[in-house]
Amino acid sequence: MNTVKTLRELRAAVAQARAEGKQIGFVPTMGNLHAGHASLVQIAAQRADFVVASIFVNPLQFGAGEDLDKYPRTLAADQERLLAAGCHLLFHPDAAEMYPHGMGDQTRVTVPGVSEGLCGASRPGHFEGVATVVTKLFNMVQPDLAVFGEKDYQQLAVIRALVQDLNMPIQIIGAPTQRAEDGLALSSRNGYLSAEQRAVAPALYRSLQSIAEALHHGARDYARLIETAQTQQREAGFTPDYLEIRNALNLRPAQLDDRHLVVLTAAHLGSTRLIDNLLVELAGQ
């Protein structure tokens, strides 16, 4: 696996792979990689001949008071994990390479609708930053396919809308959430948890499971289900941010006759904000 830092080197390497008739797969990341990221690379390697990953901690998607400066940088360990997962090329630019004219006058990409509410309400400007950097990376790499985790479900919906609306010839693949044995969704931010917090963190997923189980048993009072689950979260030590039941296909608020649902939540455990979601497929009427 080669590591390149400039757009010029990246394009030369991708052009060489294209000249050899290879399909290009792409996995964008911010580094501090775990088994969830590795699964994305493995899926890309199964679907494409040449896998490009990127590591770039994107300042545009961090709001005021968020954890940009303390976000872990673990390049050597990340390189080992990427290589083992089947990555062929790592693009590791700095901010000057990504935003050569600075970020103040940078063209921004906004995806209305799916980027609003949920994490979009809690983190103003976050999805604009995500959409902008992903658009730039897609133009830099020009992949045939790209893999994103379902763990960041709203982000995946934003990327799907972006690619569709801007007519990008890129297949977007959603990868299942990877979890620890106790159910906690793998996340780089889990490293911020104390031992005591880590022990109670799986309660976030259990609150989603309780809603899913009730839905499968015919419950349709969404407001009551949400209230009960948020009480569970508080009793476990969380401060809930949001918990909502949405249509899994378009992220609109769920209607009573919707069959494809997703339950999404964000909550703080101490100073660490965790997110999770659970897809719920209901049998037809």
Swiss-Prot record:
Disulphide linkage map: none
Signal peptide extent: none
Pathway(s) the chain acts in: Cofactor biosynthesis; (R)-pantothenate biosynthesis; (R)-pantothenate from (R)-pantoate and beta-alanine: step 1/1
UniProt keyword annotation of ATP-binding present: yes
E.C. number: 6.3.2.1
Compartments, as annotated in UniProt: Cytoplasm
Functional description taken from the UniProt entry: Catalyzes the condensation of pantoate with beta-alanine in an ATP-dependent reaction via a pantoyl-adenylate intermediate.
Quaternary structure (record): Homodimer.
Protein name as catalogued: Pantothenate synthetase
Species for this entry: Ectopseudomonas mendocina (strain ymp)
Gene transcribed to yield this protein: panC
